[in-house]
């Protein structure tokens, strides 16, 4: 069920500004200031309600805190607020207490009594729930002192973890729709396009095309109907940037879509989002409904005569529907298959009408640009890549989560300064950027700047923002196989190069990882990859071979070891190693035998054990449990 918005419709830009002032007065505690008469609560407790923390039972934490405060009669002086993602997903559930900004991590419902007793009654910190700075015994009391946050600059994520995304008044308090008001009251189409061109913003969905030019092209075509489409179909493995924006600040996207509609002369927008994002869908539905109720969507927005509304279209999770022409076909209710280009969507898009498609992060940045001005955005980043970029960090990295950094930040800074380095003291091996369409960059390219052009020059691409980190135990042939397996499975099948070509590549990679590789296989892979990249119909097919080409470029010796020596240097490919116990190191503790899931290890107490190679499934459990380094892969 949706709550009813108890505000009258906003009929002018001036009314919106007045509402912003009134609502911000209720949130002074979150700004580190004293409470006001508008909201007398002495503390505001922000609890992450993003997908990551929700999966770790943050809703139970919130419910337990609310119940405890009510029982203690403290619910009037302490306000509990659900927010979107803070970014530090590996520490969830996260709770931040204002006005001091105390950052508690890995909070459970059972911790609530102690938090209320110590923090709210006695004014003491619950130190065991504070973040411990790596390499020290020091506790960080707030986000400003946590290295993960120190090199970040939040533009697209500016309100995530700050506001309740299900209450439009909190978004308005943080200047939501002010950029729209500015555009509607002081700018025409040419002014809006020039603002985007001056900002230097390029599409964050992977292509990096100048957004101002895209809007300019759509403006240039005349039609009785035009459309604005938001691409929220985030299909890259390990990517969750767009989901987090919609979960934490959906109004930033809605506002930018309305600005786009005003610019190109469209009165209808669509958000295409995958159904696998239930929280994002729910919050987007709430945001659209509340924006309509308050008069920021629908007819005569802010009394300017501009009409614009937004509907949601759910996708079924097909990776190919991230390609804009396939997405538009899916919105039309047809099978999601790419269309030949030209004509481009700006000329013939949704239902053959002029359309522009922008992804979630791009739109979140656009609303910031119209709030702060083009120069503010352009002052961040590099000469050709302005602003910031959001990355979803995953894989073999200590600080898994969502980060937003200025363009030009190096890969090393992201992985080590923000990401906290590689777990277990293992060596960094590669970072995959750009998802299945990108490439793996090795250790000697760690100082590569993260911007559109530098990544392409290095042999990868920006993509939508997935960043998967690999260590010395990862096999690069197996990694290439994983991504090709994904793209082959997700191929729409419309064109032969992608449908059949990726299947042939996958067959060769599978053969190599099973120890059946032959001389000439590498050359076959290169020829197939180049043919597919030049002849596939859409960008997804054209870039499908990139993981193979990148790993061949930087890790060719691993392919050669698999083929010529029948060895996997990383010890990952099960067909190419056996588990062995060194009798001189084995102490006969029986720990490996007791944990083996198939009973492949035999031996008596205090005597060397033996692994039965016939029974062994090479799961690695024995290797993880051995305390004496007696087990190895050979």
Each predicted region: which residue ranges?
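Short amphipathic, charge-patterned alpha-helical segments
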Residues: 69, 256-258, 408-423
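Short, small-residue-biased leader/transition segments that mark boundaries at the very start
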Residues: 2-6
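Flexible inter-domain linker/hinge segments
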Residues: 27, 130-199, 352, 358-373, ...
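Iron-sulfur cluster-binding cysteine motifs and their immediate structural context
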Residues: 91-96, 497-503, 591-610, 621-634
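C-terminal accessory/binding modules appended to enzymatic or scaffolding proteins
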Residues: 57, 387-399, 405-407, 411, ...
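Conserved phosphate/anionic-ligand binding catalytic regions in large, soluble enzymes, centered on
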Residues: 50-54, 176, 196-218, 317-329, ...
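Ferredoxin-type iron-sulfur electron-transfer modules in oxidoreductases and energy-metabolism complexes
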Residues: 13-43, 58-82, 99-131, 179-196, ...
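Hydrophobic alpha-helical positions that pack around
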Residues: 151-152, 281-407, 419
